Amino acid sequence: MIKVDLITGFLGAGKTTFLHYYVNYLKRQNLSVCILENDYGAINVDMMLLRDLEDDKCSLEMVSGSGDACCHQRRFKTKLIAMGMQKYDRVIIEPSGVFDTDEFFDTLCEDPLSSWYEIGNIFTIVDANLNIFDNEMKYILASELACCGRAIISKISCKTNLNLLKNNLNDALNYIGDSDKIDDRIFAKDFNNITDDDFKMLMSSGYRNACLLYTSDAADEL
């Protein structure tokens, strides 16, 4: 089955930057990869920033916005069906900005996608300098953290207060009634210093759904 990874996070958190490093790692493992940019906007800037990754091991696809949510979800499913026929080793979905993870789970549970795809990992990229301004922002952040197998901290510097950030993330989870701590799911390292061993570990991050932790066996397939 084709493994599917989802990368979530606020606009500007560093999703596309992380994706560059991650996809280059997968290509070094001789895996065929397809990146699906899932966007509600008319023009996807991230798509343009990823063009340099395209080659015989990496393809780029896009689901563009317009219409209502149901229309967008139908486009999402149709695109995944077409991609499933290409027999990629791995598909990576990067939404632009806020994304409803329920759409991700619901779509992959539908036929024929459930026979072709298997969820690998859900990564949430969190800016080390994140400021949570209001409860709406806290709710959106928590909804992403609640599903991720790994929270990857971006834009780390010598001024980063990781303990304070952990407390803020746990506070967001508590806001939606998720009592599980984020601490063991945090990966904090300058993206420039992430090694292949780090990526191998990240590929077994898995995901959480309905407060249950699922562990990906992706690392065993390399």
What are these regions (language model features)?
Residues C158-T160, Y175-L213:
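C-terminal-of-GTPase-core extension/linker across diverse P-loop GTPases
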Residues Q86, R90-D180:
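Phosphate/Mg2+-binding loops and adjacent switch elements
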Residues Y214-L222:
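Single conserved hydrophobic/aromatic residue that forms the stacking wall/gate
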Residues T16, S154, Y214-T215:
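Ser/Thr-glycine-rich phosphate-binding loops at phosphate-binding pockets of nucleotides
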Residues I2-T8, A13, T17-N121, A128-I132:
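Nucleotide-state-sensitive switch-loop elements of NTP-binding domains
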Residues L11, Y40, I156, A218-A219:
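Hydrophobic pocket-lining residues within nucleotide cofactor-binding pockets
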